[in-house]
Amino acid sequence: MKIGRDGRGGLLRLLLILVLLGLLGAVYPVGTGHFQVHAQISPGDLEVLEQTAESQVPEGIRFTVTARSSSEIDDIRVFFRIMGSVRRSGYTNMEFEPGAQVTATAFVQSGGTGNYFPPGTELEYSFEIRDKSGAEVRTQRELFIYLDDRFQWLTVTSGLITVYYYGEELQGRAEGMLNAAGQTLTLMMPVLGIAPTEPLRIVTYDRYRD
């Protein structure tokens, strides 16, 4: 059976996951928390004032945007794309009361049909806002990493591999996982005949119950 390039890339990631699961039970390999960015104001009358993406692990991500216009704003959507070797995209309508200045929210659930994204997943998102005059604005695409915001995350990195951990006392274990992942990549690249191009993010928890 022949395995295509995309299939080999997925197999390489799967092998890395199996190696790391042998080192620690609670590991999520994939692609912060809560952050806030300001969109550029559109040249027209319709403008975006503020936008946020907030991790709510393990349920999903909450998106919020505030916009205003001289005409009633009546349609807002958030577009998102999961980055990585297998890219998935979609959009959802946001909830708000129509008006000249509105704040809209939408919750993208993790775990829905074909829509599971583990901690460490990188997403790209943007908002589209329309008002009754026909004006429309699309914000610039922003990158967001889905991480559990209960913890202050630290990282160790080597090449394309990054291990996320919390608590300085766990740095040694994180470095061990980083080395194991790097060795697995080195061993498997000749076998699969590919060189990885996408970042690999490994999120590790101290205890299973976390």
Set out the residue ranges of the language-model regions.
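Core hydrophobic alpha-helical transmembrane segments of single-pass membrane proteins
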Residues: 18-24
